[in-house]
Design a protein with these regions (language model features):
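Conserved, mostly hydrophobic/aromatic
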Residues: 17, 65, 75, 92, ...
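Hydrophobic faces of well-ordered beta-strands that scaffold small-molecule active sites
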Residues: 13-15, 73-75, 119-121, 207, ...
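The substrate-binding groove and active-site-proximal loops of carbohydrate-active enzymes
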Residues: 41-56, 88-102, 174-189, 205-215, ...
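Aromatic- and acidic-residue-enriched segments that line the glycan-binding/catalytic groove
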Residues: 6, 26-38, 84-96, 125-164, ...
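Active-site-proximal helices and loops of the catalytic beta/alpha 8
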Residues: 109-116, 127, 132-143, 194, ...
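Aromatic/acidic polysaccharide-binding cleft in carbohydrate-active enzymes
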Residues: 20, 32-33, 251-256, 277, ...
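Active-site-adjacent "subsite" loops/lids of carbohydrate-active enzymes
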Residues: 129-202, 210-213
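N-terminal structural segment of carbohydrate-active enzymes
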Residues: 1-118, 128, 133-137, 174, ...
Length: 411
């Protein structure tokens, strides 16, 4: 079988945006809440607080994003939710009103496409939330609800909030706030497929899939790919899988995964013994122990042999994300480590992804600190920003940086 992946991804430089933290619109008339109790933009973020970033603010920031050389944006979830990260989905067809709703998203999509910037959304299809209408109906009506078989319920009554009693349903990572879908139910599968199709038809350029390894239903992701690609053959499907992903990268499911197998050894090599271990030891990737050059080369060659070359070229390579500490903090503030890591990222086969703010030296410990508000211009690190712009320009200038062979040379 000949593996086919979207050609545009091979030439993309992604920018990952956490929508609540990139920018508040400068046009208050477009905000749903004018007197909202937002957290101070520059204050340290909290687990539950909102800072009030919105899609209008991102539209206003597209010129800056384009000036970096970015031509694709991956958004963490934007759908209606009761959490600042929006992984607790209430409505898969409604962009969160706090972000500007569907109106703002349609305007953002059009504005991004006018600048030749692709848009990839985060699909949280393993689980929903306590506020998801179908689950809420189960809470209200118990065994009589028509949606009972949409979830993995083991007994009655359900206890969605009181931890003194058994939940009696499966929540992702044992979290009662995140009821897991019953993907073996054909109605659930069809519902998710139709969500994916709806937003692709609206014009998005792909899906990043949250914890897709949790969905065990045979053929689920194969059908997902078939139905998405039937609408847009160039749609990008990328999974959040932290380790060996050969199971999903056989050409019938995902075009790539978030390449933490690149991030770990790259940081271990560039930051070495400067890596702040408490920022990485509880994570699902390993930027430690320190690696010497020959050891790093061996790790990278092993990684490049793991998947077909067509897949390597559409991996989503990264150094940090909303699920990790930021590189500046992991490296103990060492700018040389940050710049060397960025050099390796932007010269590696696959699509590089820059986590918003990393290009200006934004620090941040593990969640929630890694989700700070985008810094004021006065606080930007101009040297790191210059490094990013130069390397992105070089990557765009030379095709070999994007699709050429990768060889290790020994001095």
């Amino acid at each position: 079988m000949q593996i086919q992946t979207p050609d545009w991804v091979k030439h993309a430089v992604f920018y990952q945006i956490f929508p609540d933290r990139f920018a508040r619109s400068k046009q208050p008339r477009k905000r749903l809440l004018h007197e909202a109790r937002w957290e101070d933009w520059e204050a340290m973020p909290t687990l539950q607080g909102y800072k009030g970033g919105d899609l209008w603010g991102i539209i206003e920031g597209l010129d800056y994003i384009q000036s970096l050389g970015i031509n694709a944006i991956y958004f963490t979830p934007i759908f209606q939710s009761a959490s600042n990260h929006r992984y607790h989905t209430h409505d898969y067809y409604q962009v969160d009103p706090l972000l500007g709703g569907n109106e703002a998203f349609k305007e953002l999509l059009e504005a991004a496409h006018q600048k030749n910037i692709k848009v990839v959304l985060d699909g949280v299809f393993n689980h929903s939330s306590r506020g998801f209408f179908f689950f809420h109906d189960v809470l209200e009506n118990g065994p009589q609800s028509p949606w009972v078989n949409w979830f993995k319920i083991h007994g009655w009554p359900l206890s969605p909030y009181n931890g003194e009693f058994p939940a009696n349903y499966e929540g992702w990572a044992d979290n009662r706030a995140l009821p897991v879908f019953n993907h073996d139910n054909p109605e659930v599968k069809e519902y998710i497929m139709e969500i994916a199709e709806y937003w692709i038809k609206l014009g998005i350029d792909g899906w990043r899939l949250d914890v897709p390894f949790e969905i065990k239903t045979p053929g689920f992701w194969q059908e997902f790919r078939d139905r998405v690609k039937a609408i847009n053959p160039d749609a990008y499907i990328v999974g959040e899988v932290w380790g060996d992903s050969r199971e999903w990268l056989d050409g019938t499911q995902f075009d790539g995964v978030m390449n933490y197998l690149f991030a770990g050894p790259t940081i271990a090599f560039t930051a070495g013994d400067r890596v702040v271990l408490e920022q990485v030891q509880s994570r699902d990737y390993q930027p430690y122990p320190p690696l010497f050059a020959a050891e790093y080369a061996a790790k990278i060659q092993e990684l490049l042999q793991l998947y077909p070359w067509e897949i390597q070229l559409t991996q989503l390579n990264l150094l940090a994300s909303h699920d990790t500490a930021r590189l500046m903090t992991i490296a103990g503030g060492d700018k040389a480590s940050v710049e060397l890591s960025t050099l390796l990222l932007l010269t590696f086969p696959g699509a590089p992804s820059i986590y918003y703010g990393d290009e200006v030296g934004l620090p941040g410990a593990i969640d929630p600190d890694s989700r700070r508000g985008f810094p004021l211009e006065a606080n930007w690190d101009r040297e790191i920003l210059k490094t990013h712009r130069q390397l992105i320009e070089i990557r765009h200038q030379y095709p070999a940086m994007r699709t050429g062979d990768y060889q290790v040379l020994y001095a």
